[in-house]
Swiss-Prot record:
UniProt modified residues of type Phosphotyrosine: 139
Lineage summary: Eukaryota, Metazoa, Chordata, Craniata, Vertebrata
Gene name tied to this protein: RPL7
Protein name: Large ribosomal subunit protein uL30
Homology family: Belongs to the universal ribosomal protein uL30 family.
Chain positions found as N6-succinyllysine: 127
Organism: Bos taurus (Bovine)
Length: 248
């Protein structure tokens, strides 16, 4: 009996340092699990918010379209012509090289971020930007993009400027990190801000890298001739959407 008791006494106790390590490890594991759970809940809440926003925007776009149709019908009924509101958004595509052009033209193309042939950018239309477009009109094709064009360009060709690098917009988190402070956290927010020319259009547009479009299917007709004369250059109004389809 005495020998057995002596053996029991001789069993080495767990060192305090090991106990402390185990306790710290257990606490760390709990913290990690809590953080993981919190992140999961945050992702779930964000997905729900993005879904609700997309639903709201869809309703808003449908309402805008219906209002246009109703106004046109009312004008026809009264025997008048319906004149839509002045477009606020343009999509501009560079279609020619600039060898031998004036420094002014070169500078305007740089300001429009059209450094290469078949680069495209969104432009907010106002007096100053329209004057800029007139200066470089022989070198660009431009017009008024519809919702489908804005949507397809951003989803298919959209790249963001993140840390001065061209990054594909494959995840809403990339948008949220760069534009979250402006309330733009997903692709639908970005599309809405561009299409409606919202208060944060400048930030949203500067975030988007200039679009690199393909050579148009079927080729160009006459790059040096204006669109109204059967060429490719200049303002083609809503016909820009056809060109976007051929190049996207």
């Amino acid at each position: 009996m005495e020998g057995a008791e002596e053996k029991k006494k001789k069993v080495p106790a767990v060192p305090e340092t090991l106990k402390k390590k185990r306790k710290n490890f257990a606490e760390l594991k709990i913290k990690r699990l809590r953080k993981k759970f919190a992140q999961k809940m945050l992702r779930k809440a964000r997905r729900k918010l993005i879904y609700e926003k997309a639903k709201h925007y869809h309703k808003e776009y449908r309402q805008m379209y219906r209002t246009e149709i109703r106004m046109a019908r009312m004008a026809r009924k009264a025997g008048n012509f319906y004149v839509p509101a002045e477009p606020k958004l343009a999509f501009v595509i560079r279609i020619r090289g600039i060898n031998g052009v004036s420094p002014k033209v070169r500078k305007v193309l740089q300001l429009l971020r059209l450094r290469q042939i078949f680069n495209g950018t969104f432009v907010k239309l106002n007096k100053a930007s329209i004057n800029m477009l007139r200066i470089v009109e022989p070198y660009i094709a431009w017009g008024y993009p519809n919702l489908k064009s804005v949507n397809e360009l951003i989803y298919k060709r959209g790249y963001g400027k993140i840390n001065k690098k061209r990054i594909a917009l494959t995840d809403n988190a990339l948008i949220a990190r760069s534009l979250g402070k402006y309330g733009i956290i997903c692709m639908e927010d970005l599309i809405h801000e561009i299409y409606t020319v919202g208060k944060r259009f400048k930030e949203a547009n500067n975030f988007l890298w200039p679009f690199k479009l393909s050579s148009p299917r079927g080729g160009m007709k006459k790059k040096t001739t204006h669109f109204v004369e059967g060429g490719d250059a200049g303002n083609r109004e809503d016909q820009i959407n056809r060109l976007i389809r051929r190049m996207n």
